[in-house]
Amino acid sequence: MKPIWHLFYKEWIKTRTAFFCSLLVGVGVVFYIFIGVENKITLMGAKNYTLNILYSNPPVIYYSLLRYLPLLAAVSIGISQYVPEVAQRRIRLTLHLPVGNRTLFIGMAFYGLLLITIFNAIVLGFFLWKNSFIFPSEVTIPVRHTVWGWFLAGYWVYNYIAFTALEPNRLRQLFYALTGLIVLSLYFYDVPFHGAYGSSTP
């Protein structure tokens, strides 16, 4: 068990700056979103602004700043974790830890996914909590379905970074990168209405 904790500590040293910067930006963006929302409520009144969100065409996507935030967090964590291993050839040192290679790579992936889960739990949880205090369920439920898709995309992009960085074959790297871009594009269509991804999210 000790080698796994040593591995986690090594990964933490590499990724802590990216993680805390992403978390700070994420929480700051949520604060900024709701400062804007409260200003609009002050100017228009709560009822008028809520009706504007529900019935305007095109829709008022007041939370649009969240769209690429989980993606950027996952990219920064993934790059800080895997690029030094490959670019500086540290992966050879990592492979000399007294752990099987499969266990090693699973541990690295688990660590990264755990960081992304913590980021998502804090930022998304904070956003949904603030949202529920300001808007009725007619707004909060469709909005929740929409932003879930964006936060789930972070897991995909992290995995594709890991696959691409650790793959020694250039053609497979290209295949992983192109496949990743195609899959990720499904998460970032323009949102035509609140709850646009409701049928495909829990």
Can you say where each PLM-predicted feature lies in the sequence?
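C-terminal halves and exits of single transmembrane alpha-helices
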Residues: V99-F119, F188-T201
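Alpha-helical membrane-embedding segments
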Residues: G78-R90, I122-F135, E167-S185
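Short, well-structured alpha-helical interface segments that form or flank functional binding sites
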Residues: P3, Q88-R92, N159
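Secretory targeting signals
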Residues: V30-I41, N48-A74, I106-R170
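Helix-loop-helix units of permease transmembrane domains in multi-pass membrane transporters
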Residues: Q81-Y111
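Generic alpha-helical scaffold signal
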Residues: K2, L69-L72, S76, P84-Q88
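Hydrophobic alpha-helical transmembrane segments
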Residues: M1-Y68, S80, L166, R170-P202
